[in-house]
Every structure is written in C-alpha cells, then in structure tokens.
Amino acid sequence: MIRHLHRLPGWQRLSLYATGAVMLATGLLWLVLHYAPGGSAGELPHPLEAWTMKLHGLAAFAGLFMLGVVAGSHVPHGWRSSARHRWAHQRGSGLALCALGALLALSGYLLYYFAPEALRPALGWAHSGAGVAMAAMLVKHGRRSSQ
C-alpha cells in the first residue's frame, strides 16, 4: 500500500505553509500593534500597522491562489481516495479547512471594502479567530496525512 496516497507535492506544501505563516505572522503582528497598550501614539495608529496590513493583503492573494491549487488537485483526489482507505478521518479536517478558507476570504473582503464601523471590531476578531483556527487545523491535517 502506498503510504502517502494523496500528499501534496513539495512545492505546493512549501508554498502553502510559507504563505500561511506570512498571513498568520502579519495578522498577529497587526493585532499586537493595534491593541497593545502603548503600541500607538495616543489616537494615532502605530506606523507599522499600514505596512503590516499591506503585507497581509499581499500574502492573502498568494493564499487564495494556493487555495485554488489545493481545491483543484488535492481536495478531489483526497476525497475519492479517503473513501477507500484509512484516511477517511481526513475528510472532516479537509472540509473544515475549506470552510475556514472561504470564511477568511469573505470576512477579509468585507473588512477591506464593506464593513460598517459598528461591525468592524466583531468581524475583525472573528476573522482573527478563524485565521488562528485555520493555521492550527492545517498543521493537524498535514500531520495526520503524514502518519
């Protein structure tokens, strides 16, 4: 039996983890800069906040590309093969990753273009929580498939 029947090719795995790491790091850095006491000068935002968001947005474009790559190859192949093998438990975490990716894309779009000021903080925290959850789920999903 093949040990890693539907494992991502090396370039996809590296690109996915690198993109995810940049998105997670820039998102968490923005939270620290924005909400940490003394992080900003009074009412003015920290000078690095804008650059952090620009890098986060750039990484998000790469993340959407990688989501498309994975959705086009890994997801269908993994779905078909997991029904016949011991990797059926991977379906749940794979579906959760797809749902979180869609939620992050939608909430990021809403935050950037449409979020009213009254909803912006709650939507931002939901986006942040989903991002951290997706990072944890991605590591868990990858480790399960390598076992």
Where are these regions (language model features)?
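Membrane-embedded alpha-helical bundles that constitute the cytochrome b-like, heme-associated redox core
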Residues: 1-147
